Amino acid sequence: MSKLNIVVLAAGLGKRMYSALPKVLHPLAGKPLLVHVLDTARALAPHTTCVIYGHGGETVPQTIADESLIWVPQIPQLGTGHAVMQALPHIEKEGITLILYGDVPLTSVETLKKLIAMAGKQTLGLLTVELPDPAGYGRIVRHSETGEVAAIVEEKDASESQRSIGEINTGIMAVPNRYLHGWLCKLENNNAQGEYYLTDIVAMAVKDGVKVATANPAYVWETTGVNSKVQLAGLERIYQTAQANKLLEQGVALADPARIDIRGKLSCGRDVMIDINCIFEGDVQLDDGVKVGAHTILKDVRVAADSVIAPFSLIEAAEIGRNCRIGPYARIRPGTRLEDEVHIGNFVEVKNSALAAGSKANHLSYIGDAVVGRSVNIGAGTITCNYDGANKYQTIIEDDVFVGSDTQLIAPVRVARGSTIGAGSTITRDTPPDMLTLSRAKQLSIDGWKRPVKKPKPKN
């Protein structure tokens, strides 16, 4: 098999994006457009991947920061042909070069493999699509007798008859390296744009007797580029719809497939149910029977079987055990591990803590930097006071502890097995096991006490 070189053109300005951010760094499904393209390129196992950048300067390579890539600036930007010229020192004399675009994020690996398979030492492969309205795109001109590709004519240089052609060039092509060097050197810029068009090498291929083969993607949107926020939003919906359909085909129950956002990888077991307006970021795994309530955000989370995440919960970088109950309005922060049958209720925040099986914090509490044993009850309003303004400290709550409401645990502190903490206590020292511990001021009732009376407002 011929060595594969990939060149990604990512130097465009993106004027219609109306943004200081380089176009290829705008996010789709939570990651930059260019990263989508590079992930696809990586799946093809190329010998080299060269990225041509320009507008935005070093912002693009600094943001991506991938040492396996070859970054080459294009200054000034004089067209697609000129862009590929910049990569020539990094392209071998033999093999195939696949040309991709940093603002065309959804081309599938399968489509590109099909295109690459068509290309060879004597064949140039083009990815084309038929559009009902081809305005603005380069047209594929074929010989009237043989049907073979003769040339690609850009919109601004096309005749009236050529503009009626519905087959358009997507820009994605696989070119034999043995010809690429020579063809690029012959490019001229005597066109309406004054640019060096990469598409002109197609006519050169025909002239040199190199076959020009065409392939089509499974879906037209695989070759759709982004030039505006409108197009970006449209591709976002296309991507999310495709992801939702995959989940449905796997047996996941979605309350509304149009109202789910996947910004990473979502893996689901059997009988998983997802309500509306949920967002999944990073690597999320939902095991069998998990139910996710509406308006929930999960990021880099594993949720074990039969657990329920109630609406409006936020969980990130955490591990949730079997048959847990989370929320509504719960926040679980990074470093948290909940074992089986743990309950975290409304307006409870847990950070960098481990809760053993059967423990509960059902209302209005903060558990930070804590280790909580089995079958512990955390009363409403309990706070682990873990920060002294400079350092964080750990709270340890052993098995079978009952913590009364409105308790402050001043870390570092240990609550021993079987302890009961009276409501309203501030615990500053370790507690003994199997005893009631409380710290309160003595309750007083003052006879004859009068409430303050508001002073009358002065008259104007």
Curated annotation (Swiss-Prot):
Catalytic machinery residues: H363
Pfam hit, one: NTP_transf_3
GO molecular function annotations of the record: glucosamine-1-phosphate N-acetyltransferase activity; magnesium ion binding; UDP-N-acetylglucosamine diphosphorylase activity
Residues that hold UDP-N-acetyl-alpha-D-glucosamine according to the record: 9-12, 23, 74, 79-80, 101-103, 138, 154, 169, 227, 333, 351, 366, 377
Subcellular localization, as worded in the UniProt entry: Cytoplasm
Region (N-acetyltransferase): 251-460
Enzyme class, broadest EC rank: transferase
Gene Ontology cellular-component terms listed: cytoplasm; membrane
Chain residues that bind acetyl-CoA: A380, N386, Y387, S405, A423, R440
The protein's Enzyme Commission number: 2.7.7.23, 2.3.1.157
Any single GO BP term: UDP-N-acetylglucosamine biosynthetic process
Biochemical pathway: Nucleotide-sugar biosynthesis; UDP-N-acetyl-alpha-D-glucosamine biosynthesis; N-acetyl-alpha-D-glucosamine 1-phosphate from alpha-D-glucosamine 6-phosphate (route II): step 2/2; Nucleotide-sugar biosynthesis; UDP-N-acetyl-alpha-D-glucosamine biosynthesis; UDP-N-acetyl-alpha-D-glucosamine from N-acetyl-alpha-D-glucosamine 1-phosphate: step 1/1; Bacterial outer membrane biogenesis; LPS lipid A biosynthesis
Stretch list, region Pyrophosphorylase: 1-229
Tagged with keyword Magnesium: yes
Cofactor field: Mg(2+)
Keywords annotated in UniProt: Acyltransferase, Cell shape, Cell wall biogenesis/degradation, Cytoplasm, Magnesium, Metal-binding, Multifunctional enzyme, Nucleotidyltransferase, Peptidoglycan synthesis, Repeat, Transferase
HAMAP family the UniProt entry points to: GlmU
Role of this protein: Catalyzes the last two sequential reactions in the de novo biosynthetic pathway for UDP-N-acetylglucosamine (UDP-GlcNAc). The C-terminal domain catalyzes the transfer of acetyl group from acetyl coenzyme A to glucosamine-1-phosphate (GlcN-1-P) to produce N-acetylglucosamine-1-phosphate (GlcNAc-1-P), which is converted into UDP-GlcNAc by the transfer of uridine 5-monophosphate (from uridine 5-triphosphate), a reaction catalyzed by the N-terminal domain.
Name of this protein: Bifunctional protein GlmU
Organism, as annotated: Nitrosospira multiformis (strain ATCC 25196 / NCIMB 11849 / C 71)
